[in-house]
Every structure is written in C-alpha cells, then in structure tokens.
Amino acid sequence: MVQMQTYLTVADNTGGKIAQCIKVLGGSKRRYAKVGDIIVIAVKQAIPNSPVKKGDVHKAVIIRTSKEIRRKNGTYVRFDDNACVILDANLNPRGKRVFGPVARELRDANFMKVVSLASEVI
C-alpha cells in the first residue's frame, strides 16, 4: 500500500530514479493506493540530461508494492520494493522499457501497455 509521502522506485527508462507520492487519485478522502492505482508523484532523484527532471510532477501507476496482494485463489504476492511507472497525459507509459517484474493485477486495471513492456509478469 502506498500513501502520501511514500518514496517509490521509478521502474522505467524515463530518467527518474526515486519519486515521492504526493496524491492518491480516486476520491477526496482516499488514503491508500495499491497495484494498478494511479497516483501523482514528484521526482526526487533523476539521471542528468533525461526527459524527467528532479522536481517534476507526473501521474504514475503503481506496479509493485511491499505490502502483499491477496488473490482470488488464496495466494499472496509481495515484492521487495514499491515501484511505479511514469505516465503521460493519456495514461500511457512515458518510457519505452519497464524494469523488473510487474503484478498481474495491472492487466485487470487496463494497463496492457505496461504489462507488454515488462520482462516478467507475476
């Protein structure tokens, strides 16, 4: 689960390295976000000469969380880190590559482009 002030790893090749959640979208009182939810992030660390700069504000989708995800068949899946992929205005991924595994729940959240860019879907 991700809430405001949570630091996340940026898992794409846009140039951002570390981002901070500044808003969870989907209701005025919404506190937590899970895999497949859209959040607003501020880039805290970035690679020099990249399209994404430190201090930029973007929308992002969460692709991994440290908090376990319960599936319908009773299994649980959890990852080592909290990670996101930066999105453009049309909610398409801004980068051309996604690093690391992504959760299968992104397929249910209609982020097929992110799923197809990922090397591994768990």
UniProtKB/Swiss-Prot annotation:
**Does the keyword field hold Transport?**
no
Listed GO cellular component terms? cytosolic large ribosomal subunit
Recorded hits in InterPro entries, A to Z, give: Ribosomal_uL14, Ribosomal_uL14_bac-type, Ribosomal_uL14_CS, Ribosomal_uL14_sf
Keyword RNA-binding carried by entry: yes
Question: What SMART domains has UniProt attached to this entry?
Answer: Ribosomal_L14
Give the source's domain of life in one word. Bacteria
Q: Which keywords accompany this UniProt record? A: Ribonucleoprotein, Ribosomal protein, RNA-binding, rRNA-binding
**Entry's Gene Ontology molecular function annotations:** large ribosomal subunit rRNA binding; structural constituent of ribosome
Gene3D superfamilies named among the record's database cross-references:
Ribosomal protein L14 (2.40.150.20)
Q: Which GO terms describe its biological process?
A: translation
Job of this protein:
Binds to 23S rRNA. Forms part of two intersubunit bridges in the 70S ribosome.
The UniProt subunit note reads as follows: Part of the 50S ribosomal subunit. Forms a cluster with proteins L3 and L19. In the 70S ribosome, L14 and L19 interact and together make contacts with the 16S rRNA in bridges B5 and B8.
Q: Which family does it belong to?
A: Belongs to the universal ribosomal protein uL14 family.
> What is the name listed in the Swiss-Prot or TrEMBL entry for this protein?
Large ribosomal subunit protein uL14
Q: Which gene encodes it?
A: rplN
